[in-house]
Every structure is written in C-alpha cells, then in structure tokens.
Amino acid sequence: MTKLIWILAAILALAAPAAASAQSTDVDLDRFDGRWFEIERSHNDVQKDCSRAQIDFTRRDAADRYALLVTCTRRADGQVETLRANARITDTTSNAKFRFTLPGLLGVGGLAGQNYWVWDHDPNYNWAILALPNKSDWWVWHRSQNVSQAERTRLLARARAMGMDMNRIVHTGG
C-alpha cells in the first residue's frame, strides 16, 4: 500500500507546453478529467514493482478539487492494488499545478502531500507528460492502453527535450 501511495503521488505530476520550457502549460480541466494509462515513467523505488498503472482523475464539487483512483498491477504476482487520493489545483491561472494528498489521517495538514505539474499535453488531451516541479521523477500518460512504439518514441523525445532523464526510463504500459 505504501508503494501505491507514492505511485499515485508520482502519477499526479502535471505537464507544460509542447516545446521544452521551464514552465507548465495551461490545462483545460474538463478535458484533463477522466481515465489515463501510464505508459512510460522514470525509475523510482516506490513504483519498482508496478506496471500498467491506470489513473481515474475526477473533478469533485469544488472547481479546484479532484479525486484520484490509481490502479496498479504488481509485476511479481499480478495482484492489483488500488489507492484513493485527493488533488487540489495550486495554480488556478494555468490549472497545470496540483498538490496530491491522501484522504483521512495521513492527509491532514498536507503532511502526506506532493506537488506535480503537467509539463506538456496533446491539444486533444490524448496524452500528457507529468513530472515533479524539479523533473526528478516523470510520467507519460495516455488515453489509450495500447500505444504504438512510434508514438512512445515520439512522446519520449518530447520528454527528453524538456530535460527528463532518459537513463532512468521504465516502460510500464500496454
């Protein structure tokens, strides 16, 4: 469960413009809402046993609040783990920066929280590149679970152009 908590934290990363940039891009939250599949990511110890992560990103009643349901398949035994979390928009100008927290006791006071940015996304919201603000950990999300190798290569080139470390890449989806 601890691994899944950090997986979610990692997955909540938010993206920016199509070209390499030091800033995140504007996000249309109505279009960002919905189901995403993690297809690529940087290596991190929290997610080392997980593959085929699925993220359901759903707006709550408040305009700046979201609920997340993250599902991950463990590589070792195929067991499915799930985690529920909350996200709050921290930059309402761009809507591209979020703070993730766990509900209940662990999330009190934001102690179990992490900031994530959307660094890049498709104009039609078919894919997004997410990372921590310092880009130390990053993720590529896609609306489709099955993505061609050509599409993966293209998205990884975009991530590389934004300064994401390709030496730590993990192919996780589809």
What are these regions (language model features)?
Residues 1-7:
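Bacterial N-terminal signal peptides that target proteins for export
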Residues 18-174:
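A beta-rich soluble binding module of mature secreted/lumenal proteins
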